[in-house]
Structure formats: C-alpha cells, structure tokens
Amino acid sequence: MRVAVTGTPGTGKTTATEAVETALDVIHLNERIREEGLDAGRDEERDSLVADLDAVEAALAGEDDALIESHLAHHVDADRVVVLRCRPDILQERLVDRGEPAAKAAENAEAEALDVVLSEAVAEHGRESVYEIDTTEASPSAVAEAIEAVIDGERAPAVGTVDFTEHL
C-alpha cells in the first residue's frame, strides 16, 4: 500500500512522519528529488526546485509499500492521501520561525486558507481516498497516531472538515 502525506509547507509533514510507527518505507520525497536530480530546473522567484513529476513517478516505480511525505506527495500514485492542515496564521509563523522569507510564508498561508493542496488531492485521488487532519493544536505524536490510523484502516476518509476561509 502506498500512503501519501501532503500539505502546505509548515503543516508538520516531516515531523509527523518521522514519528509514525509503520512497516511501510518512509520516503521524504523532497530529499529524493534533490539527491536524485528529479527536477526540471529551478524557480528563481521562489528559490526552489521544480519537480519533474514524471521522473518522480518513474523513480518510485516498484515502491508500493511506502509512506511518501512531501508537499507534492498528492501528485504521485497513492492508495490513501493524508492532507495535513494548519491554521494559516500559525503556519505563517512556523515558516518565518524556520527562516522562510516573509513573502513566501504569506503565500503559503494564503494557499492553506484557500485549501489548495486539499483541492488538488481530491481532484487527483477522489474524496474516498483523502484524509484531512488538522495539526494546528495537535502534538507531533498525535498527528503520527492519526496517520497510523489511516494506514491501519482505522480512520474514515474525511474532506472538508477543516475550514480556514475566515483567514482570507
């Protein structure tokens, strides 16, 4: 089984997946993209690599028992997609605290308020495969437990349970 853990940068994907207890191989997709050159160049304005999603899919071929973590994870084939969410003002604060430029943090906070990643995940995988989890007040261990429940089939798909539109 392939499980994708995705969300806007700053929602807690890396921290949570590092705490997940699972037999699945944990793949930090952004690291793989950098290490294996699975990019199509650099976005100078955002100072980030642009992933070559076809190359990413090819690199992941045969890795069927995996927990794939990245803000891009919802773009790869997966049986279940966990979308981590965080209140936009808290998300923006987290990003600034970790050294992201204020403009980039604000852009990500707006994307979170607009449900960008959630909408993309539902469009690519369908509502029946998407599990929305609010990380705003949750500890990393609680988020990890929620992800484990998705992996184990103990949590029902949920879309639209988190609403941050008042932050627009």
Swiss-Prot record:
Superkingdom is: Archaea
Where is the stretch described as NMP? 28-51
**Which keywords does this chain's UniProt record carry?**
ATP-binding, Kinase, Nucleotide-binding, Ribosome biogenesis, rRNA processing, Transferase
| Gene Ontology biological process terms in this record | ribosomal small subunit biogenesis; rRNA processing
Q: Which reaction does it catalyse?
A: AMP + ATP = 2 ADP; ATP + H2O = ADP + phosphate + H(+)
The record's comment on protein family reads: Belongs to the adenylate kinase family. AK6 subfamily.
Q: What does this protein do?
A: Broad-specificity nucleoside monophosphate (NMP) kinase that catalyzes the reversible transfer of the terminal phosphate group between nucleoside triphosphates and monophosphates. Also has ATPase activity. Involved in the late maturation steps of the 30S ribosomal particles, specifically 16S rRNA maturation. While NMP activity is not required for ribosome maturation, ATPase activity is. Associates transiently with small ribosomal subunit protein uS11. ATP hydrolysis breaks the interaction with uS11.
Q: What is this protein called?
A: Putative adenylate kinase
Q: Which organism is it from?
A: Natronomonas pharaonis (strain ATCC 35678 / DSM 2160 / CIP 103997 / JCM 8858 / NBRC 14720 / NCIMB 2260 / Gabara)
The gene coding this protein? adk2
